[in-house]
């Protein structure tokens, strides 16, 4: 862990919620018809119990960062199908004066040479998919820089739910049961997550006392127990016993990095993302391409609008898959991939009437998301994740620590910038988003869901900036998900005429009923005298506030 930085109380200015009006309509045209929350303080995430944990911190005098941390910690208990203590995390914070980015993703163990994997892909499960978990360092770093309440206070709701239990929600129960066949035989999984030999049912009480005890150790040591203490020793011992090469020295070497965000202008807004190794640049590339089309002249759910978005996303992913990696190993800087002339040239590759395969250009030389905002003007966009549901499936016995499988995103090909290597960060799917206008905060937002995430960022921004939809309608609207080549899946909420026309243009289109494949958006929009907070109906989520 890095030394505790100075808090930023001195350079924060008190912000009155002014100068930002709502540039959208107040219609809710989709079948969900969920309404936004309007309040001076707000927390949004995919689980109501977690949102209320954050709200409790605000009510006790904490700020939005305290609320975000408490929400994130509680999510490790009440939504274990998507994240845990062994997750990674990223965050963007508006402190009242400027943005701060935090990259708390972990690096590969020192023993992960290409030769260690024999030229084969990093597996998706087991200890050899686990990079150093970074979520704990994110909580500690965010609190050290911005927190107001005592660090241990932020853990209290999660510890209570771990010890006394919580009632499992229908969505979490469904995802839990669906993942059991994949993870049942991973070391430690059944003991932690199948105490009755099965996944819990909706409405059943689930207790996680080992998890609660671990959170108490983390709270008492500000995370040191996880990276250098008793918990680190347990992680190493479990790795040694199960064929992994992660060592206590890998955990001790971990650091979370404060970074400047990267950004792109879109229709008068500036969209901010965390720089690589994260894939936020995919959203910025796609939006930069769409800047060259008059999207506002096209109906929101028309084939013309959706086709252009799909084609822009394909081009953006082609570049990301070729060039994006740990930023210390990239041959190209993000600035070159976001060059306006380059994006203009990429836009010319789009055929308005036909789906085309996408190739990288040559520029010159399960996840949880949460957002919180307070009456002082502090806003937080934060995301943490195991990657594939329960991640690696590995759980360290007696600790409740379930471990992510972020190593699965490394490449095996020699010469690829994202090739697996010692102490290297892999390409990362989780991306918090933030929008400003003329240097002032407008919206903190995210769309969880693997490679859906940048696609969701693009679709939400197009709906708001081009089609004038309010953030709740932008969350509710039907979505597409590009898969590969010309393969696209769409929600059934699109008009039949749109789906038929997309097929006519050459998209290999499937429609699916499983809305969980299309991400889950949470967003907070800054109004003149408070916030508009929204939660996606595709999850159990809630916008809470006062």
Tell me what each language-model feature is.
Residues 71-76, 244-246, 350-358, 411-420, ...:
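Short Pro/Gly-enriched beta-strand edge/turn motifs at strand-loop
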Residues 273, 435-452:
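Extended C-terminal regions of large enzymes
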Residues 2-52, 56, 64-228, 232-278, ...:
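Noncatalytic scaffold domains of N-terminal-nucleophile
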Residues 20-21, 292-386, 399, 406, ...:
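Internal maturation/activation junctions in enzymes
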